[in-house]
Regions:
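Polar/charged low-complexity regulatory segments
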Residues: 1-102, 108, 134-237
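Non-transmembrane amphipathic alpha-helical segments
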Residues: 106-116
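Conserved hydrophobic residue
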Residues: 121-122
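Short, solvent-exposed positions on alpha-helices
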Residues: 125-126
Length: 237
């Protein structure tokens, strides 16, 4: 990554280390039973999985081409650094290592593409375009995590939890819900009820059957924050 001042174009590049720190913060928020933290972690995990599949598929296509050269008698090795740098890594959440996996996959893919260019299997422009498009997708993912940390870690939203959405919640809780929904939209029902969960979460709340039914009703819009049944006919009409 680069800071805004270090970038020749005047904008910063979000590093994998920065994204790992953002995801650690959101992972910590999941301990508060925060549905938006769960939603973000699920989204990022899914997108990382998709990107890794794309890297594997595209890289394998190129690798197969190189293997054909070897079958014809030309032994080709994928490029690697003459002086590889060893870095000791340590992350305080599983999501840091998830980002490392993505970066490792991209590093391998980039070396395969550069090998293809060097061995005349791809042209210079094709190779640069392939790397540019893949880099663009990964950067888009990295950049997309920043607003979540910016807003969810604010003092006004830091205490947000599923209980804020339930009937009888305090005025402060309702304000947190209104702000979160206004910024991020409604949490998908499967995330809100816990049917779909992050791969790694600090959530430890045990939900009773009655509480689960209430969460489902709120997620489906059957009950409002005041506890009213929204399907009930209004007798004043």
């Amino acid at each position: 990554g680069r800071t805004r001042d270090e970038s020749p174009r005047g904008y910063g590049i979000t590093s994998g280390k920065k994204v790992a720190a953002v995801l650690r913060s959101i992972w910590n928020l999941s301990a508060n039973d925060n549905p938006y933290a769960d939603w973000i972690l699920v989204q990022v995990t899914d997108r990382v999985g998709e990107l890794r599949q794309q890297l594997e598929h595209a890289g394998k296509h190129f690798q197969d081409d190189l293997d054909k050269l070897q079958a014809r008698g030309l032994r080709v090795s994928v490029l690697k650094s003459r002086a590889p740098v060893e870095v000791e890594l340590g992350f305080r959440s599983p999501y840091g290592y998830m980002i490392v996996d993505l970066i490792l996959d991209f590093d391998w893919y980039a070396r395969v593409v550069k090998t293809m260019v060097q061995k005349n299997r791809l042209g210079d422009i094709e190779g640069k375009e392939d790397l540019y498009q893949m880099t663009k997708r990964i950067r888009a993912l990295f950049e997309s995590t920043l607003p979540y940390q910016k807003y969810l870690l604010r003092e006004e939203l830091r205490l947000l939890s599923r209980s804020d959405f339930l009937p009888g919640a305090s005025d402060e809780a309702r304000k947190r819900v209104e702000a979160a929904v206004g910024i991020f939209g409604e949490v998908p029902p499967p995330i809100f009820t816990g049917e779909v969960r992050p791969r790694h979460s600090r959530r430890r709340a045990d939900v009773s059957e009655a509480e689960m039914r209430l969460l489902v009703d709120v997620a489906q819009g059957k009950v409002d924050a005041a506890g009213s049944d929204l399907n009930q006919e209004n007798t004043l009409l």
